[in-house]
Amino acid sequence: MEVFVHMRGKDVELHNPEPTTTAKELADEVGHPDAHVFLEGQDIAVKPDSTLADAGIGDRANVHVSVCKKITVSVRYNQQTKSYEVPPAATLESVYARAVSKGQGFDLSDADRSQHTLQVQGATDQPDLSRHVGEFANEDCAAAFDLVMQDRFQG
């Protein structure tokens, strides 16, 4: 089977574990023996002794390996900041959806939503929203983004 492994500060890596590989063995294989394994879209880490198959991790699944069980994400827009606690395998798309929503977010109009994206604070990087929040977390299990106008390339 093929599994896409996401980790903090690294590009996505393709691994070929057996379905009988445990979450602990996968964490060991990627060089993070003390880390937790999260299936994309799940809030709770896979139990270390669970096999990938038993945990519902199938072929071509996306998992995140992280020492953090939760990431504190802050999103800044118009001199205001909203914070959320999410699992490391949460996608930036899910954070973006909360940040632009009414109630939990900044209540952007549909027109404004289509023109904005997340940008890493202190940088010009506007990462693809399919990436995991945990890829951007620091050692304190926190990540910070600005809600900005999307870069538009014309050519």
Report residues per predicted region.
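Ubiquitin system architectures
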Residues: 1-155
